[in-house]
From Swiss-Prot:
Keywords: Cell inner membrane, Cell membrane, Membrane, NAD, Quinone, Translocase, Transport, Ubiquinone. NDH-1 is composed of 14 different subunits. Subunits NuoB, C, D, E, F, and G constitute the peripheral sector of the complex. This is NADH-quinone oxidoreductase subunit D. Its EC number is 7.1.1.-. The gene is nuoD. InterPro entries: NADH_Q_OxRdtase_suD (IPR001135), NADH_UbQ_OxRdtase_49kDa_CS (IPR014029), NDH1_su_D/H (IPR022885), NiFe-Hase_large (IPR029014). It comes from Ruegeria pomeroyi (strain ATCC 700808 / DSM 15171 / DSS-3).
């Protein structure tokens, strides 16, 4: 005998078995952060199984890259983690520069650091405030988006685009920054900590926020190593692993900054890490601006990878030919394999590039940090309440551009 309302009833003993029920979380759920569909198996209110279904935003980026030149591939990286686009371009440029042996001018290197840190703040502001909204705090996103708007304007003033920048180029950056922009970024860096303090005051000691985040989604050191986590997911559990410190790239070894780490590895510690990382990024931004003022010069390594100066093209035939070849055929990268990684806001964003000596990559594998974090969702969410799923996804910091790619 079966009655849907009661579950199964054993005819002999009269015992009832209650069936777990499955629900779909997403793909249009506001807390799903994009097009995530999760099939949750619930026993009452407890999550027994959590099955993420991905691929709803798959565009075949890695395959498309094999039929484009190296420069044409750069804009694909803006469309991966579209919350902080320049950090992704950085990894692609570093991979090409490693293979070609190009040395980036110091001024370009400083500009890259400056904009990578602006990207980090863009990302953490969005994450901290929307995660607060997922657990019921409605004010932080309104404050956070006001600051993000100012940062978007800095993006726009550097390269003309608010979102898909294509500003970092192999060999440097596309254009130099005007002095007025540096002044404005510096002025902003002195007012922003007050906004951080306001968000801090709203959330950090808030009883409801703490109850929703403390001891939720705890990740241990063993799990970090097994699942291949990176970024805040590692640092929230007390491991001070930051590529800017552990394997310095660009000119990060010249900067003074701390690597914030948590203690308990739960959602609350990850929130605290992100808040402190924004303060550290402000410190790096101020140092970068001070260094940029003392460091005039070119922002592109003039050579085979980058276009000649406009003035040269008007007088030199070779420069004109070089410009034409560069933008029709593209530059050639010597055959070889290389892995380049940057500490993106979400974790270690890496590019494994296989070049065959032509003007197009033979194969490139993109290591998106969010992909590995989402893989562990079943393991981390099991045994939690249904309402905690939103909190866990929020602190994993998931964006679907990079997961589905």
């Amino acid at each position: 005998m079966m009655d849907g309302g009661k579950g199964f009833e054993d005819a002999l003993t009269g015992e009832q078995k209650i069936r777990n029920f499955n629900i779909n979380f997403g793909p249009q759920h506001p807390a799903a952060h994009g097009v995530l569909r999760m099939v949750l198996e619930l026993d009452g209110e407890i999550v027994e199984r959590c099955d993420p279904h991905i691929g709803l935003l798959h565009r075949g980026t890695e395959k498309l890259m094999e039929s484009r030149t190296y420069l044409q591939n750069l804009p694909y990286f803006d469309r991966l983690d579209y919350v902080a686009p320049m950090n992704q371009e950085h990894a692609w440029c570093l991979a090409i520069e490693k293979l070609t042996g190009v040395e980036v001018p110091r001024r370009a290197s400083l500009i890259r650091v400056l904009y990578s840190e602006i990207g980090r703040i863009l990302n953490h502001l969005l994450n901290v405030t929307t995660q607060a909204m997922d657990v019921g705090a409605l004010t932080p996103p309104l404050w956070g988006f006001e600051e993000r708007e100012k940062l978007m304007v800095f993006y726009e003033r550097a390269c003309g685009a608010r979102l898909h920048a294509a500003y970092f180029r192999p060999g440097g950056v596309h254009q130099d920054l005007p002095d007025a922009l540096l002044d404005d970024i510096e002025a902003w860096s002195h007012t922003f900590p007050n906004v951080l303090d306001d968000i801090d005051g709203l959330l950090t000691e808030n009883r409801i926020f703490k109850q929703r985040n403390c001891d939720i989604g705890v990740v241990s050191e063993e799990e970090i190593l097994q699942y291949g986590f990176s970024g805040v997911m590692v640092r929230g559990s007390g491991l001070a692993w930051d590529l800017r410190r552990a394997q310095p790239y660009e000119c990060y070894d010249e900067f003074e900054f701390q690597v914030p780490v948590g203690k308990n590895g739960d959602c609350y510690d990850r929130y605290l890490c992100r808040m402190e990382e924004m303060r550290q990024s402000i410190s790096i931004i101020r140092q970068a601006i001070a260094k940029l003022r003392d460091c005039p010069g070119d922002v592109l390594a003039r050579g085979k990878l980058t276009p000649p100066k406009r003035g040269d093209m008007k007088t030199s035939m070779e420069s004109l030919i070089h410009h034409f070849k560069l933008y029709t055929e593209g530059f050639h990268v010597p055959a070889g394999e290389v892995y380049a990684a940057v500490e993106a806001p979400k974790g270690e964003f890496g590019v494994y590039l296989v070049a065959d000596g032509t003007n197009k990559p033979y194969r490139s594998k993109i290591r998106a940090p969010g992909y590995l974090h989402l893989q562990a969702m079943d393991h981390v969410a099991r045994g939690h309440q249904l309402a905690d799923v939103a909190a866990i996804i929020g602190t994993m910091d998931i964006v679907f551009g990079e997961i589905d790619r």
